[in-house]
Amino acid sequence: MNTDVISGKKTGSKSWIRVPLLILAAAVAIFAVAEMYQRIQLWRHTRVPVLSNEQPGPFRRDNTLGWAPRESYKSAYTRSTLGGTSYPVRYSVDASGLRGCSTNGNGRKILVVGDSHTHGLEVSNDKPYPCVVARDLKASAVAYAAGGYGTLQERMALERFIPQVQPDLIIVQIGYDDFINNDFDLEKASYINNHNMLRPYWISGQIRYLWPSHFPSGFEYARAHSRLFSNWYDSLLQKKSMREQTVEVDIAKAGAAYPGFDAATTATREVFGQIKALSAGRGLVVAATELSEPYHSAFRKIFQDLNILVIEDAAVALADARARGMDVYARDNIHWSEAGHQIFGDALARGILAHPELGFK
């Protein structure tokens, strides 16, 4: 006899799932409304299409480089120095994503690749250090760079733009974070230099595209397809970066003996060997932005082995200016103000002029 009767009516064997299904349907509806709200708000402020998963701003996803400057992008905004001085910024790149300088020079061309220090979002057109160098050397210059670029991405950019620009001099900007960004395991263990995007790595003699995520791949898929999840995810990463010890702290303590540092050094050396080959017949200069250890010694050994000219004077000049109390950093205390770019560019130009074989005088 069936005893599953309430008020004389049979409930049925599947009635128990109705409440969970209703709860799930309500949760999906709430999520959909919140997601659409986020997308509409983004459209209102940036004009990114409501149904697009593209991130707004000066960079876009790129199948080869991982991410790249958004072509023909223009923007005007306000930035502040670390000392609190506000100033207007007018930013633009051309149809190739190159940030150029208004100097015409004497016909000699400079191509600069690097990371966010080279891209110079904190300063207006003609203010980034590549333009300072171009003016000092009476040359023309263009730069292709993006925040978080590692040495392999810079090599790929050179492959793309050397035929187009036909530069007389190539400048590759370096920083300690290149070692982190050149190695998958080190970047995955980092919270301050992890850009949480699919990117190319040079591993065992070949290019591999990997995502240095702290979370399972499903999180990354959801982040790429949901504005709501992306905002939550980024907030979670920011909180973790404030709590967790990052790999850079461990490397500072252990030095070059830190597990994995050798692999990063090997990859960096091999890719710079490729850059030297790409630059054959042209001037090649490496511009150091800072000289912290153990990265500085590793870089110096690489460039000695490959016979590549590295100029450290600009990093020294910038550090000296800061020690004297000059307001050379932007509010984030990472990137440079207009004064910082000017000091770095002037010192780099003097370093280039000290080597007449580069053809500038």
Where do the protein language model's features map onto the residues?
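Interaction-surface signature
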Residues: 43-61, 152-256
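Membrane/wall-proximal cationic-aromatic binding patches
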Residues: 42-135, 139, 317-322, 327-328, ...
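Membrane-interface motif at the C-terminal end of an N-terminal transmembrane signal
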Residues: 30-46
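N-terminal Sec-pathway targeting helices
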Residues: 9-27
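Short, intrinsically disordered terminal tails adjacent to the first/last structured region
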Residues: 1-10, 360-361
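Conserved, well-ordered alpha-helix/loop/beta-strand core segments that scaffold catalytic motifs
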Residues: 169-181, 234-319
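Histidine-centered active-site loop/cap adjacent to the catalytic His
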Residues: 20, 33, 330-361
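Short beta->alpha junction loops
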Residues: 143-151
